[in-house]
Amino acid sequence: MSIISRQAYADMFGPTTGDRVRLADTELWLEVEKDFTIYGDEVKFGGGKVIRDGQGQGQALSRDCLDLVITNALIIDHWGIVKADIGVKNGRIAGIGKAGNPDVQPGVTLVIGPGTEVIAGEGSIVTAGGIDSHIHFICPQQIDEALCSGVTTMLGGGTGPATGTNATTCTPGPWYMARMLEAAESLPMNLGFLGKGNASLPDALHEQVAAGAIGLKLHEDWGSTPASINNCLNVAEETDTQVAIHTDTLNESGFVEDTLAAIGDRTIHTYHTEGAGGGHAPDIIRACGLANVLPSSTNPTRPYTVNTVDEHLDMLMVCHHLDPAIPEDVAFAESRIRRETIAAEDILHDLGAFSMISSDSQAMGRVGEVITRTWQTAHKMKVQRGSLGSDPARHDNTRIKRYIAKYTINPALAHGISHEVGSIEPGKLADLVLWRPAFFGVKPSMILKGGMIAAAPMGDANASIPTPQPVHFRPMFGALGRAMHSTRMTFLSGLAIRSGLPAQLGLNSLIGEVKNCRSVKKAHMIHNDWQPLIEVDSQTYQVRANGELLTCEPAAVLPMAQRYFLF
C-alpha cells in the first residue's frame, strides 16, 4: 500500500479526519469529524486526474447521475463538520457522500456521468447560504451586497427608501406587497416579505397575509401596543405565519411585563433583543430566556467593541426620523444604547441564549456583514472566555456549530422555511457558498443559487485566463434571465398560494410555502436553545443570567477586518 503524508494529502484532496483548519485570521479552529470519501478512490477533476471517461466518470444517463458534484468539500453545518462530495440534481442537494463511477469504484453513493459538471472543493469550506431575517428593503442594491457576502435568503419588509421603510421592516398593504413580489422576480435572492402588523382589528392583517406576506412585523414606530400585539398574534395563529416585533422603547403603552403578557405563550421572533436596535429600555433582553421567544441580534452590536456605542447615536437619529434639536428625541436615542446590555449580549450568544443574527440593513445594520460579524463575535468570545465546556483545547467545533446555526438553520426554522433552505441536507435548495479557509466569513470564492453559480470573484473578462486583475465580485449566469427564475425562490403564506396568487401576479420563480411557524419554540433553536432567567438592574443596567453577572470588555481589535479590505 502506498503511503502519503497528511500534508501532501491535504494539499491534493483537502483535509481529512482529524486535520484542523483555522477560520480566517480568527482564533477559531475546526477539526474534521468524518471523511465520507474513500482513501485511494477520491475523485478529482483535471488533466491526468480521476474524473475522466471510464474512470471516475461512468456512462449513466442524466436521469441517473448528478448535474453537479462539488468534490472533496469541507462542510461546516449545524449537524457536523465533515469532508465529503456534495451532489446536486435539479437545483437541489441530492446527497452528501462519495461521488464517482460505481462501475469501477467502491462505495459510490453519488454517480458522476457525462451530464455532470464539477466544482473542485478540495481545500475549500462549503456552508449553506446565509439567511438574513431582518431586512429593510430600502434599495435593491442590498441584494448584490448580501449575495456576495454569502447570504442567499433575505426576509423582511419595505418598499424602497420611504420614510416608513427606513425605520421599519414592513411592506404595508396588498398593493405594495404585490409590487414587491413582482420586483423580486428580477433579483437573484430568495425573498419573503413581512406585512405591517400594527393594528387592533384583524381584517387589515388578514388581507396582507392573503396578499403574500410570510408574516407580520410589529414596530414601535407604528405603535407596538398590547392590543396590537395580541391582535397580530391572533392573526398569525390563524394563518400559520410568524410575527416579528420591535417593542416599545419609551415604555409608553406598557413595560416589558405588559408586552410579555400580551404575547402570552405564543411564539414570536424578537428583533435586536438586546435593545440598542429598539425595545423596552432597559430590560427587553429579559425576553431571550423565555420558551416561546425566538431572540435575534442585529449586527451593529456584534460584537461589542470600543466603537460600538459611539456610532450608534447618529445611526439611530437618522433611521428613526429623530431631530437632534429636540431634547426628547435625543433622550429617546440615548435610552437605547447601554454598554452593559451590549456586553451581556456577547456572552448570551456564546452560551446559546440568543439564537439568531441578522443585519437590520441600512437601518442601523450592514447588509453585507452578517456572516463576518457572527464569526467576529465567536472569535471575541473564544479569546475572552476560552473554549466552550464541550470543546477540547485543540478545536472549537461546538462553538462553530453554534454560531453557524445563528444565520442558517435557526432563522429558517423561525420563519417556517427550513424545509427549503438553511442547511446542507438532501432535498433542500442547493444554495451553497464556497470559501477558501483564509477568507472564510469575509469573501466567498463562489456563491451557488439553486445549484447554479450566481456570483463569484472574477478577473478581467478579456484576459486569457479567469484570474488576472482586477478581480471583483460579478454576477454569473445563474443570476441572469430565466435561469434566475429557476434558481431563486419567493416565499409566500399558504393562504396566498392556495388562493392562486402566484398565477395572478404572473410570478415565474420557484414558490416556497412558509409552514409550522406557530409550533416552533426556543427549544427548537439548534445549539442556541438556552433559557436562563434574565434580570436587569434598572439603575446600573447590569445583566444577570440565573444570578450570574454577565460582563465583558469591548474589543479594541478584531479579525476579519481591515487586512481583508485593502483592495
Swiss-Prot record:
It comes from the Bacteria. SUPFAM superfamilies: Composite domain of metallo-dependent hydrolases, Metallo-dependent hydrolases. Its EC number is 3.5.1.5. One of its GO terms (molecular function) is nickel cation binding. Carboxylation allows a single lysine to coordinate two nickel ions. GO terms for cellular component: cytoplasm. Substrate binds at residue 219. Residues 129-567 form the Urease domain. Ni(2+) 2 binds at residues 217, 246, 272. The keyword rRNA-binding does not apply. The active site is at 320 (proton donor). PROSITE patterns: UREASE_1 (PS01120), UREASE_2 (PS00145), UREASE_3 (PS51368). It catalyses: urea + 2 H2O + H(+) = hydrogencarbonate + 2 NH4(+). Pathway: Nitrogen metabolism; urea degradation; CO(2) and NH(3) from urea (urease route): step 1/1. Keywords: Cytoplasm, Hydrolase, Metal-binding, Nickel. Ni(2+) 1 binds at residues 134, 136, 217, 360. Its cofactor is Ni cation. It is found in: Cytoplasm. Binds 2 nickel ions per subunit. The modification N6-carboxylysine is found at residue 217. HAMAP family: Urease_alpha. Heterotrimer of UreA (gamma), UreB (beta) and UreC (alpha) subunits. Three heterotrimers associate to form the active enzyme. Belongs to the metallo-dependent hydrolases superfamily. Urease alpha subunit family. This is Urease subunit alpha. It comes from Tolumonas auensis (strain DSM 9187 / NBRC 110442 / TA 4).
